[in-house]
């Protein structure tokens, strides 16, 4: 994985020291099935069962760089899957000196929610109270726990996510795939959002109940 991380840095996909440190510390091999451990360092999505995948490292790096997770933040992670991205976010938001920092991860498929919990537990993020994994429909966010500093979605929506946008704090960021593009939304004030589109990606569809 070190070689791949260095390549992503060289190619300009990875720039932020905290995100680079997270990718070096939270090992992808700890979030896949035993039969695929030898493929953990490959820059490709891998199956995790139930028609879902663990995203390729390049895509995860790209989305984390857009999101810019920081210590002490409260982040909603929709589509926990294997738990890898959730654990990377937890590494970034953990704030040992000042406390705070939470990642609330939502996974629709019960078996994957349990898989994510088991994998994340290897890093003690659940035990420390940094990560909570909820089994349920995250496609409309978690209004009762809003607002969030950041929201990230790991599966592709079909249209602009108005309900998720409303759950951001002012200045907050939402990173979400819509069809074959990754979109970044930054909340400027109550009504207005800055948005950017980055085309050329493929994702599994966002499941809603």
Report residues per predicted region.
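Class I SAM-dependent transferase core
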Residues: 1-76, 84-92, 112-124, 193-208
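Conserved nucleotide-cofactor-binding alpha/beta core module
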Residues: 68-96, 100-194
